[in-house]
């Protein structure tokens, strides 16, 4: 019969059962046709892929970090003890003059200063002016790390009370300094101390408020107060920093 091909079931099993090599080759051809030629698509995809983003909290090199020294701690402790703002301490002031000759107050301040800096007694500290005392404490307490035993408790207790209504803890200060402003770790004790000093009740013995009288009842209030403290710390250091734009991924800038 013409048109009918007679096959041997053993010899031509591949054709009979549709497992012949022609089908396999056709499938491979389809795979090759669908695959990217010369790796073009893979290269394009690699070129289009976004580069890894830098961590938002990484401090930026163009903004200098700060160092909270023994001299800084001395100034903060004296200003806190004498109920003044740090900027109101004059170069000629001394612990003796600031305590108005009250030996009990003077002696307690000297004890606290020695404890904060882990120095014990500091010879001549009572009579030394602020410039001399700063130089002396910096030289004697080179290994100081903020905060010491006195300021850590004083500042922490005060901030816990002040920030309590907002639901924020003192650690929020460091988080905002590092993660939002992208400043170095050295800024944290400066901003923390500044915020604590500025939120004390009452007024300075040398006149004027300690800081803004705005309420810190909400989280946004606390954030704004921290931002203000950062700007004021920067100004005291002769710097001007700007909060980075949320979408830019860049760090705080300095003028």
Where are these regions (language model features)?
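4′-phosphopantetheine-dependent carrier domains
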Residues: 1-255
């Amino acid at each position: 019969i013409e048109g009918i091909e007679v096959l041997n079931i053993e010899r031509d099993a591949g054709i009979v059962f549709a497992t012949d090599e022609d089908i396999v080759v056709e499938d491979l051809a389809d795979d090759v046709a669908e695959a990217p030629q010369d790796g073009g698509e893979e290269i394009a995809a690699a070129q289009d892929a976004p580069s890894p983003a830098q961590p938002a909290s990484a401090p930026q090199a163009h903004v200098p970090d700060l160092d909270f020294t023994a001299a800084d701690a001395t100034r903060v402790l004296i200003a806190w003890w004498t109920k003044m703002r740090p900027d109101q301490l004059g170069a000629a002031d001394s612990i003796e003059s600031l305590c108005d000759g009250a030996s009990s107050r003077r002696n307690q301040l000297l004890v606290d200063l020695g404890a904060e800096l882990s120095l014990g007694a500091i010879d001549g500290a009572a009579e030394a002016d602020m410039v001399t005392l700063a130089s002396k404490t910096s030289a004697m307490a080179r290994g100081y790390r903020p905060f010491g035993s006195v300021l850590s408790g004083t500042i922490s207790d005060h901030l816990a009370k002040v920030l309590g209504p907002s639901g924020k803890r003192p650690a929020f200060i460091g988080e905002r300094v590092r993660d939002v402003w992208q400043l170095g770790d050295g800024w944290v004790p400066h901003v923390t101390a500044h915020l604590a000093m500025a939120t004390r009740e009452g007024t300075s013995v040398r006149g004027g408020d300690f800081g803004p009288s705005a309420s810190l009842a909400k989280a946004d209030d606390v954030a704004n107060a921290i931002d203000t403290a950062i700007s004021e710390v920067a100004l005291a250091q002769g710097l001007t920093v700007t909060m980075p734009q949320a979408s830019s991924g860049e760090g705080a800038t300095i003028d």
